Regions:
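Transmembrane helix boundary and interhelical loop/hinge segments in multi-pass membrane proteins
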Residues: 73-94, 107-108
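Long, hydrophobic alpha-helical segments
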Residues: 57-83
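Terminal transmembrane helical anchor/hairpin motif
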Residues: 39-51, 173-241
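Aromatic- and glycine-rich beta-strand/loop motifs that create alpha-glucan
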Residues: 1-23, 239-247
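Hydrophobic alpha-helical transmembrane segments of multi-pass membrane transport/permease proteins
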Residues: 17-41, 66-69, 175-184, 224
């Protein structure tokens, strides 16, 4: 399993596409930090009640969430599966000593670590934003858990599409993922809670909301269901390959 993780990390690190993602995300977060800082500090002159630090942090976290979870993670997940298809490695993996669960966990962990590396690239900007105050360490930890649960779910959705389709995979992936993020925001208020972006914004509010943890548990539950469905499909394929090998 560790060999799969290392292989996937090398695949992403050696691609110009990954370095372009790194540069684009850092540039985007830097620009949003500068714009938000100027805007909110100007606003505080006329309204001292504005919580500048918390508002800046909310904008940065929301932007990073959309960039990583909504844009970068699907690309990395689909590329991970397509690379195995191009090189016809899947059949070799299926016939190896690794179980289907280990293969899936290896692919999932590789993409999660690559996504986490993209987040780490923006760490200096978030450290700089601490000088504006307004948020607590607990906010960072809660946001990290929301990132992990949602990222896991969206990566598994991308895996499922990449294993099922041969064309327009990224288009379908973006369609589903961006719909989950944004469509609930234009629906009546109770449906807002389906959107992980709503949950993320809720985590940085001064008062805690138990719905945050309920939704995080829901994302992990749906992710587990998709994982089981992918496992069942691949296990059936592995069984067929082994039967053909015996013949």
């Amino acid at each position: 399993m560790f060999a799969i993780i290392i292989k996937d990390l090398r695949l992403h690190a050696n691609q110009p596409k990954y370095r372009l993602l790194q540069f684009s995300i850092v540039l985007l977060i830097s620009a949003m930090f500068f714009i938000a800082t100027v805007e909110y500090f100007v606003s505080t002159r006329s309204n001292s009640q504005i919580d500048t630090g918390r508002n800046i942090f909310t904008i940065l976290v929301s932007t990073l969430f959309i960039a990583i979870t909504g844009v970068a993670a699907p690309i990395l997940a689909i590329e991970s599966i397509q690379d195995e298809r191009r090189n016809a490695n899947f059949d070799l993996l299926y016939l190896s000593r690794l179980s289907v669960v280990q293969i899936l966990l290896g692919k999932l962990t590789g993409v999660l670590l690559a996504s986490f590396a993209l987040i780490l690239m923006t760490a200096p900007i978030f450290i700089l934003s601490t000088f504006t105050g307004g948020f607590r360490l607990r906010d960072l930890l809660t946001c990290g858990i929301v990132f992990l649960s949602t990222n896991t779910l969206f990566i598994l959705i991308s895996f499922s599409l990449a294993l099922s389709l041969h064309e327009n995979i990224l288009s379908y992936g973006y369609g589903i993922i961006l719909a989950v993020i944004f469509l609930p925001l234009v629906a009546p208020k109770p449906i807002w809670w389906i959107s992980p972006l709503t949950i993320l914004i809720e985590t940085v509010k001064p008062e805690s909301n138990p719905k945050v943890w309920l939704n995080v548990g829901g994302y992990f539950a749906v992710a587990l269901l998709i994982f089981i469905l992918i496992h069942q499909r691949l296990a059936f394929k592995v069984k067929g390959l082994k039967l053909r090998g015996r013949q």
